[in-house]
């Protein structure tokens, strides 16, 4: 088994706060494989507006309307995406397999268990998403792209 592997150093996307942590994991991953991010950002530039009556008060509702599915964008640029539900017992082996195949794993975690998140570690549960781009079995560590706080832009 390989002891160390880094698929490539990810460049964080911190120009703006974009949607949520999933996209802040996805955008650097997409940039790693394509060299650019515009297709993802421009895909969501379409907006839908509607007026709804909420408690008898007309309210303007704005929604993003993606012009293409993300699957179509990935396929267009030759990126293969595989969604997996993995038990925590198999998560490490599965992630290492993805990295050994030159992929990047984007996983959901609970910040309560992540020491890097000083604001939430052992304090409260918060769902989060991180990209994993490398590992070092000699130190039992993964290389991840992460911010310092729950609402920080990485």
PLM features per residue range, with description:
Residues 73-86, 121-126, 144-150:
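Hydrophobic transmembrane alpha-helix bundles
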Residues 33-56, 88-141:
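Active-site-adjacent substructure of cysteine-protease-like catalytic cores
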Residues 136-154:
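Noncatalytic regulatory segments and standalone regulatory/sensor domains
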């Amino acid at each position: 088994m390989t002891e160390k592997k880094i698929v490539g150093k990810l460049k964080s996307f911190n120009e703006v706060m974009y949607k949520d942590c999933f996209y802040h994991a996805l955008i650097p991953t997409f940039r790693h494989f394509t060299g650019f991010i515009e297709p993802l950002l421009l895909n969501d530039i379409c907006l839908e507006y509607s007026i709804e009556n909420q408690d008898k008060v007309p309210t303007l509702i704005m929604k993003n309307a993606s012009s293409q599915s993300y699957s179509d964008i990935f396929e267009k640029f030759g990126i293969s995406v595989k969604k997996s539900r993995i038990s925590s017992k198999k998560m490490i082996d599965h992630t290492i397999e993805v990295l050994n195949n030159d992929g990047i794993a984007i996983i959901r975690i609970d910040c309560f268990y992540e020491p890097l998140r000083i604001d939430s570690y052992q304090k409260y549960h918060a769902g989060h998403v991180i990209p994993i781009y490398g590992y070092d079995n000699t130190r039992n560590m993964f290389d991840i792209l992460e911010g310092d706080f729950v609402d920080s832009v990485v």
